Amino acid sequence: MIKFVDMFSGIGGFREGLTRAGGFECVGHCEIDKYANRSYNALFDTKGEWFVEDARKADPETMPEFQLLCGGFPCQAFSTAGSRKGFGDPRGTLFFELARLAEARKPEYLLFENVPYVQKCIRYIMYTNQICIAPPKNSGARLFLLCFTVHNMFLSAKR
């Protein structure tokens, strides 16, 4: 059973998907929107799980053991419908909270979701050494940045 923490959980898309996939157990979540969090708690049994409202206040020392850190950090800073300021937008910098927690806890797996433009921003900061989420050389680990459109998921919307 792979234990995971659901960051920027919204109403629980990652949790629902991982639950349906099987072999995953959620041990905590983070969500700042009180209405989304209320829905999350109504949809899932979260009693006894770790919770923090604001990712910027997440203390890695208080987090339970987990192998997978997942999160769909806010996309407005990276989307064509939003500002597209990337990490220049305060919402875009929430990606760094995931990186901070990953650096501190070193989970076996990271699973992040966002719009395609975020790849460009992440690659830039990796190449300029502003942050390192790439695995160390000779570690045997690999980093994959994959881009899927809703068409890959058989949905008719274009995003």
Q: What feature does the model see in each segment?
A:
Residues 1-159:
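Conserved active-site and SAM-binding loop architecture
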